[in-house]
């Protein structure tokens, strides 16, 4: 085996070689039989003309003999020369930097003067010329080759050719090229040196006159290769960064490629360092390393990557390495090559040629060996550059790119929803069976592009809406005046298309003609050049102007885009569309453009208005109508019927039938005036079916009256002829909008004295008024009540058609009215949460005139909250709406306005009351959403006997406090009990918490039961003649029964 000699070997002269001076033309040099030693240890070590241990002994003797004959040895570097002229020329340029001499073990000392071997110089000034075939060579020997020997080559000196640049091999670089030792990537091994058969003809080397020019070209090539290696390393790092989040579809392959890339990076770093240290060395392994690092995609031909000065040099292919013409069409330098296209492979990268690692960058169903370069280019042509997914067609890639851009170009013409594909839009259109599908609505996305830069219509950017245009309508607009944005922006796209800051001025495209609804996207104009998809994929790059490239440009411009067009300029919240943004702005401005023409309530959206209009719709043919037994007036609500009967009994309503048109109002009845000037009267049939707490508290009340609510002592007047006008809207705090109707007393306010309406105010009601006023200061701001008058008995318009809603309406009005001492409203039920109210009521009369002057300001209406002020004044919490704030305030005040009419429990919200109703479970089959409960047990107690009423309730409650005609009292109770017994299923329990009262005279009340009066038979109208007579005690001072009772004093099962 070979061994490395000392660092500075000395040439030893042999006795038998002295005196012989005839030059020998050829002495095959020795080389390492184990090629890894010179390749790894010293890249510049000569590995020319290797000899092997397998050569026969006679060949070795011949080699020794040739080396001893006429060899001139340099004393400084021990270089050996065959010619005296070369030896003399060498002496002039020789330095004391000796090469490493590698010899075979069987070789003996070589004489210093006779040896004519090859030149082993490493000097950059004399490579490639010391071991060349000389023209002046004398004798020659025939090329001899043993049949079974492959490593020894004998050259004929007479066949030496003059050096021609066209015959110089790319592997020469100043070294002997006619050798059977080559650097080649071997499969399954990391050995970089391979021995070829001696059949290949040796290549001639350049002459001495071309050495400086060759050295200059080599230096240029080294610089180019260093730059290419650095560029390749940068590309590898960037691809690794992409692979961290892009190659999710092939996780195992991505990890393997990363590991291989890191290994290659280390080897490249070592090679670059070696190139810097051995700049003058021109070894074969170094040359192969340089050539392997040339990006294949940048090699249009076999010599295109070389310096222009090296153009005369041609690449000499051998039997196993052929330069294919398709190298310029390879998709990427990162892709593994087929075996037939292994070109300039590095000895360090032979691991990449393993079969198990060939197909890591391709889909699993495609073999790396079977795919031709042209097929690879077609395969990776439709590859997503963001997630590395490969698609079969360009249209599939476009659809996929929309998942990155977020754009949805297909818009439903009915509802405005957007979709990424036409098929999804067609499927969605089936949801609109009332609209006939128009084939033109499903225009192909590829054909609908904007003029100028070819951006699709749906990729255009919508403008943010102009705030003054918020009040126009609720429909989304496609084009509005832009606010602070270029005029070439358009509307009608997904807000998720563009986010981020504003575009530079040089990326703004010019205005383009109208096409499909708007101009084009900023920053994607024809003058804006974006990186193409698959930056290293050669022909895989989309063609300029294609839809795929535009979509990729859109993804790249997302971070550079303008401010989101659907972002609120006030709170910077991003909405889903322009219409949502417009409705969102109304939360800041307090605007409610949609007003109910019946009750005057305003809403921010048309949908809420439509929902509200269902409250006013009545269908008397379906709903049960209850007729008054006295005047035969029909009611759809039993609560209003009972109030109507109470007014009959109190003399507030004449006992004669009312006019046919109950909507004929007196002059004192205010009309509902809308913002658009339309007026509407409140008819008793247009009663409110359902008033939700959220709707009541969040409503906007349009202003049609300038009257200011007056303090409590000044609004009480007992004129029975005054009209009573009631509005159902209880305006909520915190909303900006015109006030609805200030329902105030139309009678005498100037006298200052208050006549009792029949309900005695005492200290407890005053304190309740005070407490409630402190809890809810904004409750009284728009609602004041008027006295009932026979001329206008439309008080039932405040009540609900259904007992459940009426119960809530009364709970929110009657409790407030009675706690504020407003006795003018005849209330059937007294809403007092029994959980915290326990009042002992004296029988003495306390009028409102006895109120302390210091308490009067507490009862005055508080100023309205301004818009956007939904903050709790006690704890500082903020809420999104006035309804939420109102519910929250009940946690501070302890107010529980929703009371169960069965067990008496009170709740803060209607929803909690609904849930509580389900716990009783009795008679829920006939309940309307759990709130309309029949009271058969109560009817069983009442029966048909008039005396049963007095037996059920205490006498001190039932005994009239004024002189009442016994005939009227007996007839009324008989009628009531009989009617209830007949129509049991139509009686519903609405309220509890107090005992409902039945007035028998003006203001005098008595408790009948916890039920409301349902439909009364016309047969009971016979008592109308007796009831028509007004009571003789109308002028007598009135007394009242207690407002509140203890929680457990009376319970209705």
UniProtKB/Swiss-Prot annotation:
Feature: compositional bias, Basic and acidic residues: 130-149, 810-821
Q: Which GO terms describe its cellular component?
A: cytoplasm; heterochromatin; intracellular membrane-bounded organelle; nucleoplasm; nucleus; protein-containing complex
Q: Where is this region: Disordered?
A: 1-62, 116-149, 483-546, 694-714, 736-776, 788-828, 1018-1039
PTM comment: Isoform SALL4B exists primarily as a ubiquitinated form.
Give the matching InterPro entries: Sal_C2H2-zinc-finger, Znf_C2H2_sf, Znf_C2H2_type
Q: What is its main location?
A: cytoplasm
The covalently linked position for Glycyl lysine isopeptide (Lys-Gly) (interchain with G-Cter in SUMO1), per the record, is 156, 316, 374, 838
Q: Does the keyword Secreted apply?
A: no
* Record field: compositional bias (Low complexity): 20-46, 698-708
Where do the ZnF regions (C2H2-type) fall?
72-94, 382-404, 410-432, 566-588, 594-616, 626-648, 870-892, 898-920
Superkingdom, natural source: Eukaryota
Its keywords, alphabetically, are: Cytoplasm, Deafness, Disease variant, DNA-binding, Isopeptide bond, Metal-binding, Nucleus, Oncogene, Phosphoprotein, Repeat, Transcription, Transcription regulation, Ubl conjugation, Zinc, Zinc-finger
Any one of the GO BP annotations: embryonic limb morphogenesis
Coiled-coil region(s): none
Tissue-level expression = Expressed in testis. Constitutively expressed in acute myeloid leukemia (AML).
Q: Which residues carry this modification: Phosphothreonine?
A: 541
Summary of subunit composition and partner proteins: Interacts with POU5F1/OCT4. Interacts with NANOG. Interacts with BEND3. Interacts with NSD2 (via PHD-type zinc fingers 1, 2 and 3). Interacts with NRBP1.
Linked disorder?
Answer: Duane-radial ray syndrome: Disorder characterized by the association of forearm malformations with Duane retraction syndrome. IVIC syndrome: An autosomal dominant condition characterized by upper limbs anomalies (radial ray defects, carpal bones fusion), extraocular motor disturbances, congenital bilateral non-progressive mixed hearing loss. Other less consistent malformations include heart involvement, mild thrombocytopenia and leukocytosis (before age 50), shoulder girdle hypoplasia, imperforate anus, kidney malrotation or rectovaginal fistula. The IVIC syndrome is an allelic disorder of Duane-radial ray syndrome with a similar phenotype.
The molecule here is called: Sal-like protein 4
Q: Organism, per UniProt?
A: Homo sapiens (Human)
